[in-house]
Amino acid sequence: MDFNTLIEIFYTLYKERTAVYPTNSSESDVKKWNEATLDFFRIQLEPYVFKYLEHTYGAALDAHWAKHVFPKKSRFALVIVERRCHPNWWFILRNIAWAAPYCSLYIFCSNTNQAVLQSYLGDKADTVHLIPWFTGDVSRDEGRIQTNITFKTAEFYKMIDADYMLRFEMDTYFLQKVPEAIFVGDFYGSPWGWVPERPGGGGLTVRKISAMIDICEKDRALIDPSGEDAWIGNAIVKYGYSVPTIEFRSQVFLENSPPHSVPIGIHQFWTFLMNFNIQDRSAFEKIIRCLVTLAV
């Protein structure tokens, strides 16, 4: 898939979504529109993004992958929690090996996708921490609940032999090499536009392991049904843990705000294009090109 094809698909779906935006409507109407369209467009666009990335950069990343060996132990760990046989595995494994070769890799999988992951890893399986954390197939909602519980559990963090971890979801990727300098503070993720002063979160988050264990073992009354990143963010604020400035965080990760510079990591930006306030197709193409161009 070439860039022009990707843009045509993106722009068509973007216009479809904006065409049904409830202008001059109540906050409730806008919320209903968002709930009705956001997940649909996220699912529609994601396969095209990764198809383009694999087509454009797959060969170069695969060449690096062939020579790469994950360190069994490092101060910095990449951590993936994923129980599915996800279609993005091939690209993501090569992307992280290229972007952060000094990091160890922990994959918390299930007994249903462990064998598939071993085949993807091939001769690298012996140097990757592949941990069957989940059992069986569950519904999407139940899977989300179990994942949130995992990140609120001290025992989970105690299994990661590192000072820092970078949590990495299956709809994320790195545009640039990951410098060790991003591993600072106790917790942060992509800035959230509606609460920019908070630690943020999303599919890419940096976490200091000792701080996560401390938080999970502190006040158990903090636990609530919210997403794990919001839950940890609340504890970070409550107990006065360290968070980098929003200026720093904006240069590291991007999720739901327009880019002011090229970030290091991306999390499903295609879901939040409405937030970018794009006025014309030329500007649209410029932003999309920025967010799908890897420094390979």
Model-predicted regions and their roles:
Residues 3-94:
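N-proximal low-complexity "stem/linker" segments adjacent to membrane-targeting elements
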Residues 80-82, 107-111, 189:
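Short beta-strand/turn micro-motifs composed of small residues
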Residues 83-86, 111-114, 134-136, 171-174, ...:
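Short, solvent-exposed loop/turn segments at secondary-structure junctions
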Residues 94-103:
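Short, acidic, metal-binding catalytic loop of nucleotide-sugar glycosyltransferases
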Residues 117-118, 175-179, 216:
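Short glycine-/acidic-enriched loop or helix-start segments at secondary-structure transitions
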Residues 153-193:
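GT-A fold catalytic core of metal-dependent nucleotide-sugar glycosyltransferases
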Residues 199-296:
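Catalytic core and acceptor-binding pocket of nucleotide-sugar-dependent glycosyltransferases
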